[in-house]
From Swiss-Prot:
EC number(s) given by UniProt: 4.1.1.23
Protein name listed in UniProt: Orotidine 5'-phosphate decarboxylase
Keywords assigned: Decarboxylase, Lyase, Pyrimidine biosynthesis
Family to which this protein belongs: Belongs to the OMP decarboxylase family. Type 1 subfamily.
Species whose genome carries this gene: Cereibacter sphaeroides (strain ATCC 17023 / DSM 158 / JCM 6121 / CCUG 31486 / LMG 2827 / NBRC 12203 / NCIMB 8253 / ATH 2.4.1.) (Rhodobacter sphaeroides)
GO cellular component: cytosol
Length: 232
């Protein structure tokens, strides 16, 4: 049985390629992430096919960021697709609106803290306040959780510190920026292995290219799951 702690990112351009990859992965994967790049290529149709016809769990990675009323309405629309996770940016007003939009459904709202493709130099270049990157991530996580987020998206390097927050009890930590042992970093800068991410408190890890670019994606997915610690 697939380990649902692994979420495979379907970072492919259209539904046909997404379904082809899901077919190749078969029962080795039970949880998929569909991102913004796929949305115009039929992402919601793909989500519906995987969820309703194949029994997979779906994480829609939209990183919504707008005024509260707009976010609430958008989330209410997404909730009608019976999704599992949806991302918003971690501004408290956005989080509160998203949680309200998801009320009455099983959709969990995850707040983005600091993208795993960014480092301190990137924050400086974008004039984001000075400070330790881990400290900024922790502050953003705490604010989002205080606003009612069901969980946060953060680098595996910050997972342990977030898990130690009082607000994080019973909340989800989902970590992109996870690379299997020996895999190339790609565009990720703050990374860890699957084993390290889970050991440090992540509930789910997100892995994309190391799986879907592999010659045998199914074997690659199973290899990632083999790196995960045994469930306690």
């Amino acid at each position: 049985m697939a380990d649902d702690r692994l979420i495979v990112a379907l970072d492919v351009p259209n539904v046909v390629q997404g379904l082809d990859l899901a077919e190749r992965l078969g029962d080795a994967v039970s949880f998929y992430k569909i991102g913004l790049g796929m949305l115009t290529g039929g992402g919601l149709a793909l989500a519906n096919e995987l969820k309703q016809e194949r029994g997979k769990r779906i994480f829609l990675d939209m990183k919504l960021f707008d005024i509260g009323a707009t976010v609430e309405a958008a989330v209410r629309g997404f909730a009608s697709y019976d999704l599992d996770f949806l991302t918003v940016h971690g501004d408290p007003q956005v989080v509160r609106a998203a949680v309200q939009g998801a009320s009455g459904s099983g959709l969990r709202i995850l707040a983005v803290t600091v993208l795993t493709s960014l480092d301190r130099a990137d924050l400086d270049a974008n004039m984001i306040r000075a400070g330790d990157l881990a400290e900024i991530t922790l502050e953003r996580a705490a604010r989002a959780l205080d606003a009612g987020a069901h969980g946060v998206i953060a680098s595996p390097q910050e997972a342990a510190a977030i898990r130690a927050l009082p607000q994080a009890a019973g909340r989800l930590i989902v970590t992109p920026g996870v690379r299997p042992t020996g895999a190339a970093l790609g565009d990720q800068k703050r990374v860890a292995t699957p084993a390290r991410a889970i050991a440090d408190g992540a509930d789910h890890i997100v892995v994309g290219r190391p799986i879907w670019q592999a010659g045998d994606p199914r074997a690659a997915a199973l290899a990632v799951q083999a790196e995960l610690p045994t469930r306690g």
